[in-house]
């Protein structure tokens, strides 16, 4: 009997966090380009999407999307970047059709949903743009002087000075192959084998990182280590073919 009692208590404790989590779900979940609060949106008309979290089936009859430059403007419906107006439709994915988006800017948005006799307003969320146009890129490609037969991994390092405390900082980085980014000795990002492979004659992918916490007022150091990729294949060292 004591064993049954202990097991019962353990199950109650195990399920409490799950129940608590379910109760904290927002009434409406929002995403931009299938991401929640994404950095690095670089399309002119991103897809805004949502779904209702309800225990009972609800049929959406109409919606309204509101996009603003700031959270304050969003909450007061003032100086909106886009107001779709009330649209009678059950669509839950809509392309942004407001004023042209600016590069390197955070936008706040929310959705109002009408169901049968009820209006639901989502909590505010945001998306942040990166390089909207090719002209937004100011950087130049860098490389070392060795050919692809040189096996050691190239490393680049740059020391710079921040005159003021860092409010916000982003890093936009790409490589024709793979890279590992460091700032002040810390690895930036949790993923590997970035960026993804494409036909480099047509398109090159890049990654966006929020590096605010990695930087400091005063001296900072950024480093990049390059790995073999599609422009510098080393078959034996990468795939162990001999």
Which stretches of residues belong to each language-model region?
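Bacterial Sec-dependent N-terminal signal peptides
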Residues: 1-26
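Pro/Thr/Ser/Gly-rich low-complexity, intrinsically disordered linker/stalk tracts
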Residues: 23-56, 126-133
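Exposed beta-strand and adjacent loop surfaces of beta-rich binding modules
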Residues: 29, 47, 60-64, 168, ...
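Short hydrophobic alpha-helix segments
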Residues: 30, 84, 123-125, 191
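Low-complexity, Pro/Ser/Thr- and charge-rich linker/hinge segments at domain boundaries
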Residues: 30, 129-151
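Short, solvent-exposed beta-strand/turn "edge" segments of beta-rich domains on protein surfaces
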Residues: 38-42, 102, 149-150
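Accessory beta-strand-rich segments of carbohydrate-active enzymes
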Residues: 50, 87, 93-94, 106-110, ...
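Recognizes extended acidic, P/S/T-rich segments that occur
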Residues: 52, 58-106, 112, 116-121, ...
